[in-house]
């Protein structure tokens, strides 16, 4: 976990205006900067960037956040990747676990080694791209595949010359440690030679565009057809996808991402205008791949050959996706005719028919899930139904998306003819409990007893986000029972007060990332942005804020006193409740 003080320092050294202006040309508009939103199509600028509060907001689509949030959303990076991206820009080293970064010399050495490896793969990619220009056989192969110079350049395709040590033309001495560590050169008991020879080369880039590895394809029928870089300090095939960096703009424009099996499929699809394709790197689609895909788009499509190998790969992808599923994301599976792969299909039928098949003939995960599991099972028999329950049970248990999990279990209930309550018991879950009126008196949530309070609480949260220094005016007694938005307000104030200095709004938002109150904070902050109430408050506003806090405290104390009095009349109070009531009554008098 990255320390919060590091995030604070990183944001303090980062100017969000510079970060966004590199991607979206900004124009000064009053105190803020404006542009057309990069996250949706629009003609009139509604995307605002605040240099003082260091956050962005789109008044049309609602996108908002700090510099970290922008990099995550715009480049499709995870939180740690976005932090690393910004840290590299300002020369900071992201702290690692287990005290790896305690020693400055160790940090510097590690950073130097990382840079050397990155420079090595970049130089190799340039070498391969240059070699392609001078090899007629390689150029003829790509020409036969119908690839234009623009697509070849966009994906950085190249050619690894035949021979044992072509990289000696670039790297001296040969070999060196970096060549071996990046997998470019094989060390076979002291004998060194290039891994990639006489192959079309596909550079593999990380989300920041840096070359981290390669895939190489033969020009003839030699084996292996594809050869990939091994896992290295730069490259992990289970956590990277080919074409993700090159296709990021097309993915955003289409609103979907397409997973295919081979590098050439990705490039061929791009040649025909389908630029949102990616491919796994010599491995099945992993859970990490699914996480990455879901960060890129709401709709994820898998397109595989219709043969047994393709269907096996599709099912592996589905299995690995189950724990990562979300109710606002959808997965679809398209199986092409056995004689086709995506490359040959789009060449034969064109972009329009390919996308029509993708959108209208692909099967949603829910349909493919039951189709695959039911294959070969006789559901007209009791034994078949029992088998389906048994085989689906461990898979259903992995699904954490609540709505989808519920609907899939409802579908299983229909398929096997078992009542949902009884089926839940078979699946190892408790059946839904009947509503029974509780005998024990429970203190009511303050939002129920005082419907005006959530609105007032939200106003205070909004004011605190805009003016973090006002947290000094919030002092909540320990004995108060807090829930809902009031608990959120208390946590927000405590977070700000624990900060060594008064944080900016963007820093506060990042501190709340991953907390139980993140959704509430974002909802209220978004409301403030939409209402354009984001200017800092003056002296009168600060006084009103303090009055509001006092009013909330009084309302909360009164509500809890009344609840305890009612319980005292009904069933009596225990010792802790008596002490609580005494504290509340004493506070009320003061």
Curated annotation (Swiss-Prot):
Signal peptide: none annotated. It is an enzyme of class 2 (transferase). This is DNA primase. Pfam families: DnaB_bind, DnaG_DnaB_bind, DNAG_N, Toprim_2, Zn_ribbon_DnaG. One of its GO terms (cellular component) is cytoplasm. RNA polymerase that catalyzes the synthesis of short RNA molecules used as primers for DNA polymerase during DNA replication. Keywords: DNA replication, DNA-binding, DNA-directed RNA polymerase, Magnesium, Metal-binding, Nucleotidyltransferase, Primosome, Transcription, Transferase, Zinc, Zinc-finger. GO terms for molecular function: DNA binding; DNA-directed RNA polymerase activity; zinc ion binding. Mg(2+) 2 binds at residues 305, 307. Its cofactor is Zn(2+); Mg(2+). Its EC number is 2.7.7.101. It comes from Neisseria meningitidis serogroup A / serotype 4A (strain DSM 15465 / Z2491).
